[in-house]
A protein has these predicted regions:
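Accessory, non-ATPase domains that flank or precede helicase/AAA+ motor cores in DNA-metabolism machines
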Residues: 1-243
Length: 243
């Protein structure tokens, strides 16, 4: 019988620490598992944040209950990015996770979702293009940069420095691209955030307009990231409560 491995997970509860469980096999970082939690061993969803490892422990380690989604909705690079944010802001990783990820997101992504978050952006050669005179003609520029065809299901992320700006851009593009365009900022409801997260993961949403928090969405086929007023200080997070 193969020896069990240990994995570290973040549970779907607003707790500021990670937990360790046993798993019968190695799991991909970002996989969703169900684990027994607390004295009552209530089964809740969790996301793996480490590869399987072996380590002697002087305390009881529970086994995971089941593997809900081995493909997961977070790539290992996303988890690595979350860890970097945790170290940079000196905030616990679970707190980073829960401040960035919509509530109950682990509960709405089932094993039927078979798309892999390949982090396409990092595997391609992208060039930075600075638009110096980005005036009232921004809509004309955006329409020029956004291109769709039947063969490619490209996604576009348009970032604005503030919520008001994201609304203005969204309403302008919504008139043109209809259901292909979605808005993501702190003013939309948790239910809407869950819907957008899942649609982006499935590549159903092609254009996302939002503030800086939108960069954490699970894009699969992102083609371009367009940053409006990239010099704006609001892109720099100065508050330890991430938004």
């Amino acid at each position: 019988m193969a020896e069990s491995l240990l994995i570290d997970v973040i549970v779907s509860l607003p707790l500021n620490k990670s937990y360790t469980y046993k798993t019968p096999k190695s799991l991909k970082i970002g996989s969703i598992v169900k684990v027994p939690f607390g004295h009552n061993n209530e089964k809740i969803n969790a996301v793996t944040i480490s590869n399987g490892y072996k380590k002697k422990t002087n305390y009881l380690v529970k086994n995971i209950s089941s593997i809900e989604n081995e493909i997961g909705i977070f790539s290992s690079k996303q988890i690595k990015f979350f860890k970097w944010i945790s170290e940079y802001y000196l905030i616990s990783l679970p707190k980073i996770f829960h401040s960035i990820i919509p509530k109950n997101i682990l509960n709405i992504v089932s094993s039927e979702d078979h798309l892999i978050n390949n982090n396409i952006l990092s595997s391609q050669n992208y060039k930075t293009k600075l638009i110096v005179e980005f005036s009232d003609n921004y809509l004309k520029y955006l329409r020029k940069e956004i291109k769709f065809d039947k063969k490619n299901n490209f996604q576009y992320l348009i970032l604005a420095p503030n919520i008001l700006g994201s609304f203005e851009i969204f309403y302008s593009l919504k008139k043109i691209y209809k259901e292909k365009c979605s808005l993501y900022n702190s003013k939309i409801s948790d239910k809407e955030k869950q819907k957008i997260w899942k649609n982006v993961f499935k590549s159903n949403n092609n254009i996302i307009v939002g503030v800086k928090s939108a960069i954490f969405l699970p894009f699969n086929f992102i083609s371009k990231i367009i940053v409006i007023d990239e010099h704006d200080h609001l892109y720099k997070e100065s508050d330890r409560i991430l938004r």
